Amino acid sequence: MSKFNRIHLVVLDSVGIGAAPDADKFFNAGVADTDSDTLGHISETAGLSVPNMVKIGLGNISRPIPLKTVPTEDNPTGYVTKLEEVSLGKDTMTGHWEIMGLNITEPFDTFWNGFPEEILTKIEEFSGRKIIREANKPYSGTAVIDDFGPRQMETGELIVYTSADPVLQIAAHEDIIPVEELYKICEYARSITLERPALLGRIIARPYVGEPGNFTRTANRHDYAVSPFQDTVLNKLADAGVPTYAVGKINDIFNGSGITNDMGHNKSNSHGIDTLIKTLQLPEFTKGFSFTNLVDFDANFGHRRDPEGYRDCLHEFDNRLPEIIANMKEDDLLLITADHGNDPTYAGTDHTREYIPLLAYSASFTGNGLIPQGHFADISATVAENFGVDAAMIGESFLGHLK
């Protein structure tokens, strides 16, 4: 019998809690990640007030220097620790795949200076359309169509861009490049990015409509992902008949593998929290696992190096945490964590190699305290043990520490 009938894992995308031991091997604009500290530097430079996470024990997580504006809690309502990544990457897919039990020894490729000419030329030859070279770099999805949409409407050229993650994105105005044509181009791009030196996690079709100055991305987005190279705990749960619910980009990250119920993409963190709450309220969701990603921390504030915006985003989540808890049952378990860091005060604009926090809460807890410090995959090992399925490649369960 399961200790918890339902477990809800919420990933606060990029909310790291201090440089990992191997941060010297990862870089931002030529600077090693050794001094990165997402939560620490936000609390230091912008101030941070997250009383609901403090109650669970956020401020009690072991750190060389305590979080400046996040106090410790003498009698927390939950259990906390920090977890280290073992995989050779600091991107979204690597972090999430490891959380679900995989050790990624061959990281995906990222293209901070844009894609090489060889890839662009192949896409041009296949599509019969030119590519706007100035867009070929890490770019905000809304900014790139604002900047190059008018030109695309005049010339029919493709807008090809990337991000901090191993993705190739193609934006196309639906009146200029029909959606079906865009999909065919993306399918081709997927076929040429399945191995080094261009091993990409996802190709994303990004259709949009509107006029210059008023472009809007449509619901016709389509992701061409790769499935995890081995079964994750999601697969093991699904195979055992345990329902799995994906909120936000979780379904895309795992290419639908092991997901029995996709609750859709998030328009914002707040929308994602709304979707999570609706998921918690589903009458048929009496047992199982929900997995939510809230990406605004990373996409809107981490990469843009905006510590004040990042702080406000954390405040927004913390303010809504009681709503999430209010919709949980007594024998539910809530796990709050991250997938990598993205220190908004650091050099460059890339993710940072950091520990991630882990907060565990259940109304059924009679104890509290620290969970032994471990690794990302300990989360999935704990979920697996709770539901009586095998763990994946790696991970040590901390289920026995939750009392």
From Swiss-Prot:
Keyword Metal-binding annotated: yes
Cellular component terms per the entry's GO annotation: cytosol
Subcellular location: Cytoplasm
Enzyme Commission number(s) of this protein: 5.4.2.7
Pathway field: Carbohydrate degradation; 2-deoxy-D-ribose 1-phosphate degradation; D-glyceraldehyde 3-phosphate and acetaldehyde from 2-deoxy-alpha-D-ribose 1-phosphate: step 1/2
Keywords of the record: Cytoplasm, Isomerase, Manganese, Metal-binding
BP term (GO), one: metabolic compound salvage
CC cofactor note: Binds 2 manganese ions.
Entry binding sites for Mn(2+) 2: D298, H303, H351
Positions with a binding annotation for Mn(2+) 1: D13, D339, H340
Cofactors required: Mn(2+)
Molecular function terms, GO-annotated: magnesium ion binding; manganese ion binding; phosphopentomutase activity
Class in the EC hierarchy, top level: isomerase
Catalytic activity annotation: 2-deoxy-alpha-D-ribose 1-phosphate = 2-deoxy-D-ribose 5-phosphate; alpha-D-ribose 1-phosphate = D-ribose 5-phosphate
Pfam family, one: Metalloenzyme
Its biological purpose: Isomerase that catalyzes the conversion of deoxy-ribose 1-phosphate (dRib-1-P) and ribose 1-phosphate (Rib-1-P) to deoxy-ribose 5-phosphate (dRib-5-P) and ribose 5-phosphate (Rib-5-P), respectively.
Entry similarity comment: Belongs to the phosphopentomutase family.
HAMAP family: Phosphopentomut (MF_00740)
Matching NCBIfam families: deoB (TIGR01696), PRK05362.1 (NF003766)
Record-given protein name: Phosphopentomutase
UniProt source species: Streptococcus pyogenes serotype M18 (strain MGAS8232)
